[in-house]
Amino acid sequence: MVEIFATGRSLVDLYGSDGSEAKKEMNHPVMPKRVGYLYDKMLDKDLIRFVILESARHKHARHEVRKVLAHLERYVEQTYKILADGSYVPTRPKLKTIYDDSSQKQRELKIVPFWPDGIVHRLIVEVMKPVLMRGMHPYSCASIPGRGGARIRKYLAHAMSCDPKGTRYACEMDIRHFYPSVPIRRLIRTIGRKIKDKRFLRLIWAILKSCGQGLAIGYYICQWLANFYLEKLDWMLARMPGVKYYTRYMDNITMLGPNKRMLHRARVAAEKFLRDELGLAVKENWQVYRTAVARKAKGRPRAVSAVGFRFWHGFTTLRRRNFLRMLRQARRIQKKQKMGIPVSVQQAAGFLSRAGQLNHCNSFRVKEKYIRSIKIKRLKEVIRNESKRQCKAGWALYGRTPPATA
């Protein structure tokens, strides 16, 4: 007996006599459920107020931020109005060139006003964050709350210590000129696979077009979209045969596995996917190397270098460049403390930050030789006094007095 559905189609008509239609549907990629009404979520005055206060954290020294906070409710109303009637027009960014000490490169920042552009960017991310995080790879890190370099450091250190056979080989890759090379049209189409709110997508399109070619370094929204754009690449590489451990810190990709040939295949697949699907390219300085050397073989093993550390089988050390910078800072502070010259807040904070990295690697001898002779309590006292001074100045800015402490 042939069972008939309410539509009038039988089981044979629906699936085919040999089940070919069912197989076809199973193999076809299913469109993910898309989210709508995100623009309407932005039209919430409580959310706008929260975003303004969050965006102003650690920026009270800026005149434009103090102006917005002094008339908070007025700016909440104005933000709501320009979004509700669609009168918001993205501001053309100002260009600023800085020298990035960590990467030893000159970078071009694009800066927009705190209001309205900075607030609108943050509002977009706030309502879009659950959508972007939904399919993100667990070890896709950088510029995401709770996903910094420490997450990758723990993962790689554990892998190198506990699985020497599965980490015999490593592959390191870097995307060439990542931010300025992202094609905006492809990015918007990729976002459209998860978001169906056309008004919301038009707003993102207008912001991205205003920043010129590619994504802008300095836009809060761009760092989220950059991670989202590489989501497909992350899952493709993480699932490839021979790739046992996979991490990505913004545009720096690290893969570990037991077989060198399989890692080369993953590298070639990544280059093809980036070129054909994402419109990007891999730098020529990619590396595939062995992290362990057999006892009878000549040569030394190489360490995996990522997020400021070098990961060996069984222990972790600081990168040479980071170690030398910490050493120079330590000698300057030692000299000042011996001569009785006060250490500046910037020097104290910078040294304590770099010295804190030693707590996350094997550094007993380094601490004994370079850190023990420095009076750490004095440096913490300098930072504490500056923090109290800034706190009192912040209360005085609004004509109030700080609460009494016990």
Task: Give the location of each predicted region.
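Active-site-proximal segment of RNA-dependent polymerases
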Residues: 25-38, 125-183
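A common structural junction motif
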Residues: 195, 271-280
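Reverse-transcriptase-like RNA-dependent polymerase core
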Residues: 82-105, 119, 196-210
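Conserved pre-motif C helix in the palm subdomain of viral-like polymerases
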Residues: 106-137, 212-239
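Beta-rich nucleic-acid/ligand-interaction surfaces
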Residues: 142-152, 254-256, 287-297
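Non-catalytic, polymerase-adjacent accessory regions of viral genome-replication enzymes
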Residues: 1-77, 81, 398, 402-406
